[in-house]
């Protein structure tokens, strides 16, 4: 059935066009549009992500090289640099943001697991900074001479899918964005030291959710009671009360303090949590799994285009980031639905070289043989989605 369909066209079958069209109607995205629709725009942007294009000009040149295939690839009649740049600059980014969230929901539903054996979902929250030229991206002012944006992400550690993302200028403190996090009752939220915002931690506590946050070294507290028999690696497991007046005002209840020594790194870590039911090794293990979000950021920057932007306006930057997230989720959905026993790096490499081929997807992934990433490049390539049901 797919013998005459291009690989990229086969990929788009995994996208819900009806839902995307609903969002286009909701925001009037195709108003006064004759040829280059929002759907054409989305596919062009995702083609650029999957084919590893470096710039808008690079993307348009690549599409122009396949002019005769444009219609069957889903781009419409043709794609010019002017039309794509104008679309990214003027069309409502909420269309692409909400579609990215829709794909996030689909990917998370398909990849649901129970790795931690806990009743609620387990999330890590962190941000990554992308530096920008202040003269060009004037709206992203960070300091007098620098520009940049932050991508704040709530990462589902079990499905390995970003559940929530918030884009801000780089000048915004990480802890200030905690108020934007959607809180689920019974879920677990893992934070690094930059998120010692006791007001927001107490909000999580009051909604019946749990948190584990790495404590700052200058934390002021007093022990209320502590455990004397401790598992290996656990130095302290105590119930504490905050003593600094402002902190105690923001978090008036007792907290749990766990000090853990990591033999692999020869480092000591101190955590705060409201999860008194967990064992102390479970608390430490939850934090140790926070590294997955750092791998996600590294993977996103290395293999999708969010470090070099194809437009200079805030709207264009947002559309590019949401297109990258759509591409990320598309790979996750394909891996699950096709039961691919490959890393995301392998899947992307295969796709980037084959988007305009007419090989059926099943044959494409079965016939292409890649050596182990580490053997090929001599370094540890972060891989995600490697395990699925």
Predicted regions and their residues:
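Single, function-defining residue in the core of a domain
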Residues: 1-58, 91, 98-102, 117-121, ...
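Major-groove recognition helix of helix-turn-helix-like DNA-binding domains
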Residues: 73-91
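Short alpha-helical linear motifs
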Residues: 82-86, 107-110, 368-374
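A glycine- and small-aliphatic-rich helix-loop capping segment at beta-alpha/alpha-beta transitions
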Residues: 140
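A short, well-structured juxtamembrane/interface segment
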Residues: 105-113, 174-175
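DNA-recognition alpha helix
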Residues: 55-73
């Amino acid at each position: 059935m797919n013998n005459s369909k291009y690989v990229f066209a086969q990929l788009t079958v995994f996208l819900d066009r009806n839902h995307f069209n609903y969002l286009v109607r909701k925001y009037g995205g195709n108003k006064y549009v004759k040829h280059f629709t929002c759907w054409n725009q989305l596919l062009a942007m995702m083609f650029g992500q999957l084919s590893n294009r470096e710039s808008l000009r690079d993307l348009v040149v690549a599409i122009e090289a396949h002019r005769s295939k444009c219609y069957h690839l889903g781009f419409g009649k043709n794609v010019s640099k002017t039309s794509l740049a104008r679309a990214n600059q003027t069309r409502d980014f909420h269309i692409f943001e909400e579609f990215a969230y829709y794909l996030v929901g689909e990917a998370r539903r398909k990849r649901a697991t129970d790795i931690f054996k806990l009743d609620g979902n387990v999330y890590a929250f962190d941000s990554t900074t992308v530096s920008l030229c202040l003269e060009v991206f004037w709206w992203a002012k960070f300091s007098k001479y620098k520009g940049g944006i932050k991508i704040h992400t709530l990462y589902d550690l079990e499905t390995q899918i970003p559940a929530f993302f918030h884009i801000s200028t780089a000048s915004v403190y990480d802890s200030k964005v905690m108020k934007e996090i959607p809180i689920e009752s019974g879920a677990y939220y893992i934070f690094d030291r930059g998120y010692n915002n006791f007001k927001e931690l107490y909000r999580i506590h009051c909604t019946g959710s749990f948190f584990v946050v790495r404590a700052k070294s200058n934390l002021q507290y007093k022990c209320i009671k502590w455990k004397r028999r401790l598992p290996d690696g656990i130095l302290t497991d105590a119930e504490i009360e905050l003593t600094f007046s402002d902190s105690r005002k923001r978090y008036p209840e007792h907290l749990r303090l766990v000090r853990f020594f990591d033999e692999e790194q020869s480092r000591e870590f101190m955590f705060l949590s409201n999860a008194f039911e967990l064992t102390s090794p479970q608390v430490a293990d939850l934090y140790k799994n926070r590294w997955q979000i750092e791998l996600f950021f590294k993977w996103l920057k290395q293999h999708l285009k969010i470090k070099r932007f194809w437009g200079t306006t805030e709207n264009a930057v947002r559309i590019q980031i949401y297109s990258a997230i759509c591409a990320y989720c598309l790979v996750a959905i394909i891996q699950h639905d096709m039961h691919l026993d490959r890393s995301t790096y392998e899947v992307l490499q295969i796709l980037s070289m084959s988007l305009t081929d007419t090989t059926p997807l099943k044959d494409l992934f079965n016939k292409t043989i890649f050596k182990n990433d580490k053997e090929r490049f001599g370094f540890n390539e972060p891989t995600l989605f490697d395990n699925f049901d």
